[in-house]
């Protein structure tokens, strides 16, 4: 074992000694850690979910640090021929509100990259931004666990997500950029669905036009 491996091994040993109680306490106190932990948990649960779908195979998980080339958390083949990409995002805990008038929950989903990177827009312009482009992925998936205590996901087409209104970008740029936040309600509004097969078929039909 070389010196680098010895140091790395010490870090793993520290992790092994952390108790479940400590993890729970720290996670509840730290919103950023909570977001990271729940985000990865949502990814793993989604992976298990699509493994059960016999129409889906060749599931791929991309490097989290390679967002220049890969904009989705998972992609897979549907019916052996349609490559579908899914971006998983979680509800922001502190954004959850109860709408008494309409008897529903309101919340915000953070729908952007973790750090700025240079992107090229369809009109040829290059900008540095955390915003996703329209079409960077096919489907936005959001776990509904905070509302129903079950690992059920809400799905929305990328093309139907809110576009950016940020004044820093010109009108010609904004039409190619998604907003960094997406509103969600529970029960779900029109545009969202819990049926993955249904929304995949919408993607396939759109791509076949």
Task: Describe the function of each predicted region.
Residues 31-44, 92-101, 172-189, 195:
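Short low-complexity stretches enriched in small and charged residues
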Residues 147-209:
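Non-catalytic C-terminal interaction segments of nucleic acid-processing enzymes
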């Amino acid at each position: 074992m070389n010196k680098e491996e010895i140091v790395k091994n010490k870090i793993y040993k520290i992790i092994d000694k952390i108790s479940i109680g400590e993890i729970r306490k720290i996670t509840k106190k730290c919103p950023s850690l909570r977001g990271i932990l729940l985000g990865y948990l949502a990814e793993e649960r989604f992976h298990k979910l699509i493994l059960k779908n016999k129409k889906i195979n060749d599931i791929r998980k991309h490097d989290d640090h390679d967002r220049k080339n890969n904009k989705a958390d998972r992609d897979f083949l549907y019916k052996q021929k349609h490559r579908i990409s899914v971006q998983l995002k979680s509800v922001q805990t502190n954004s959850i509100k109860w709408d008494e008038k309409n008897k529903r929950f309101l919340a915000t989903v953070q729908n952007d990259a973790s750090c700025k990177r240079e992107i090229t827009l369809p009109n040829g312009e290059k900008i540095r931004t955390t915003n996703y482009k329209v079409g960077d992925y096919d489907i936005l998936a959001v776990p509904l666990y905070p509302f129903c205590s079950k690992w059920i996901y809400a799905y929305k087409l990328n093309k139907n997500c809110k576009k950016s209104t940020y004044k820093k970008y010109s009108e010609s740029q904004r039409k190619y950029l998604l907003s960094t936040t997406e509103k969600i309600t529970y029960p779900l509004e029109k545009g969202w669905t819990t049926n993955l097969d249904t929304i995949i078929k919408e993607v396939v039909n759109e791509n076949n036009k």
